[in-house]
């Protein structure tokens, strides 16, 4: 964290350093989420993945091993999660920076991506992606499709490695092998969430969305809950995000007050000063 980063806490657009710092603090210091429950991707992840897709045409002319745009994109970020099995996590948080705007993707039950479409029951853990956007200007379908494509490739790579390891150990039993198939992409652009009132608070709202989501995850105790097919279809934001249901009007009370953004900026600046020796 530099002085330039710190100065952005006043009223400027939060950059990648500040987003990563804020999200890391939430998961590692404030709420102490275990790795088996949550993985937070770097703020560079999505941008780097898209760079790989964009470079496909120029790369395929001199590298005939590149089979597809998606394979090249995956190769750009493959090593970023080499030390963690993201499919053991219940949730993945992915901050997205696109067109000078931040939004947040929350992937639920990534391990259920291999459940063939049409086979999930209402109360089963369900693979889905939520999109929280404080301006509503990001294309939810495009963003979630890119992450869906990444996860499918990551699953195939992971399974291939596990099969190879079993073969090395002399285990040739394929009885536990599931029929190849993937769940459909199911996404939801969450409505009714607090929105920014200016052009610079999008990063602050990403941290606020993440904080309130993590806070609710831990509210139920040590056993962090999950999202079922029924919860997704019925948009049970009270059970997923902890939003309070408003019986009159059939909607939800505000998740938090939008004015929190000003306090959040001040708190972030103070935190950077307090942690200067540790994070500089």
Predicted regions mapped to residue ranges:
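C-terminal folded domains that constitute the principal catalytic or ligand-binding module
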Residues: 144, 152-280
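Ordered, helix-dominated protein-protein interaction surfaces in large eukaryotic regulatory proteins
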Residues: 21-24, 28, 42, 94-98, ...
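Exposed alpha-helical structural elements
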Residues: 4-5, 17-21, 76-79, 146, ...
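Cysteine protease catalytic domains with a Cys-His-Asp triad
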Residues: 1-103, 107-129, 137-140, 166-167, ...
